[in-house]
Curated annotation (Swiss-Prot):
Substrate binds at T125, K277, N286, R295. One of its GO terms (cellular component) is cytoplasm. Binds 1 divalent metal cation per subunit. One of its GO terms (molecular function) is NAD binding. InterPro entries: PdxA, PdxA_fam. Its EC number is 1.1.1.262. Catalyzes the NAD(P)-dependent oxidation of 4-(phosphooxy)-L-threonine (HTP) into 2-amino-3-oxo-4-(phosphooxy)butyric acid which spontaneously decarboxylates to form 3-amino-2-oxopropyl phosphate (AHAP). The keyword Lipid biosynthesis does not apply. This is 4-hydroxythreonine-4-phosphate dehydrogenase. The gene is pdxA.
Length: 328
């Protein structure tokens, strides 16, 4: 079985809670948790009286101990918490790279806390890419429907940048690289995958009336890619407002799984994350492609407003753990 390293995320958030809730459902796993042993044990003892779900006992888990340097207040953003989560991610990544684990699961971090600690990265994905010496890591969100069993895969061509910066960041070279990553991932599940690419502009440009990128180069880029890769079905650019309609049908009804594509390529962050979160909020898993190992993360944030209360749901973290075991 794939051994996981699990970085515990921002200690002021819900990372410890969702990890312990998820691991309570997978007692046969032998993960390596990376964080502060004393803090994790204290969090467990604080959660026990108010939590209505089972929790894994940290004393029964292997922990790579990286102690906190100062006290952390649940729900409060701080440089100390940012420094801790940054260090825990680094140590967990090193554990995978040196063979102590085969895949990485990361609990959520707060970018503001990282910045306060002097670590100016857009997110964990970019730090992981740096640690691994990779310059082209990509964010893919995957989920399996509990209603139909269909697997929903959406990859982002661009990630944490302002919307105004997307047209310049979106180049033919980037689009082709992202298509290649999506194709490779989807071949795990189907030999001849069907991929769909959303347009950049409303109605995919409306023949140049609402934007020109589709006419100027996106359509030609997709056609050229299809010609070079004939063992797939490539659709696009598809008007964004209808691109994921088939995904909704496939997600909700096992009789319509063929309406969904094997993979979707969104051209910017919210274009892809809106359908993912509408359909699969508790099931979606953030998966990083382009690293020398598989990394997954739950598709939610630090949950500062719920920290220490026992009310956080562990379903998305459990999905992240299961996905890492399955695909890692």
């Amino acid at each position: 079985m794939t051994r996981l390293a699990i970085a515990l995320g921002d200690p002021a958030g819900i990372g410890a809670e969702v990890v312990l809730k998820a691991l309570a459902h997978r007692p046969s796993l032998n993960p390596l948790l990376v964080g502060c042993r004393q803090w994790l044990q204290a969090s467990y003892e604080q959660l026990l009286p108010c939590c209505h779900e089972p929790l894994a006992d940290p004393s029964q888990l292997e922990i790579l101990d990286e102690p906190l340097t100062e006290a952390i207040t649940p729900g409060s953003i701080s440089a100390a918490a940012g420094a801790a989560s940054f260090g825990w991610l680094t140590r967990a990544t090193e554990a995978v790279l040196d063979g102590r684990a085969q895949a990485l699961v990361t609990a959520p971090i707060a970018k503001t806390a990282w910045h306060q600690a002097g670590h100016h990265y857009p997110g964990q994905t970019e730090r992981l890419a740096e640690l691994c010496g990779c310059d082209d890591a990509a964010m893919l969100f995957t989920a399996r429907s509990p209603q139909s069993g269909w697997r929903f895969n959406t990859l982002l061509a661009t990630t944490h940048i302002p919307l105004s910066s997307v047209p310049a960041a979106l180049t033919p070279e980037r689009l082709e690289r992202r298509l290649g990553q999506l194709e490779d991932f989807c071949r795990r599940f189907r030999q001849r995958p069907r991929l769909r690419v959303a347009g950049l502009n409303p109605h995919a440009g409306e023949a140049g009336q609402l934007g020109t990128e589709e006419q100027r180069w996106i359509t030609a880029c997709l056609q050229a890619y299809q010609q070079r890769h004939n063992n797939l079905q490539l659709e696009g650019p598809v008007p964004p407002d209808t691109c994921w309609l088939g995904a909704a049908q496939a997600w909700n009804d096992s009789q319509h799984v063929e309406e969904g594509c094997d993979g979707y390529l969104a051209l910017y962050h919210d274009q892809g994350l809106i359908p993912v979160k509408v359909l699969a909020f508790d099931q979606a898993v953030n998966t990083t492609l382009g690293l020398p190992f598989l990394r997954t993360s739950p598709d939610h944030g630090t949950g500062f407003d719920r920290a220490g209360q026992g009310s956080a749901r562990g379903a998305s973290m459990l999905a992240a753990i299961d996905t890492a075991v399955e695909l890692g």
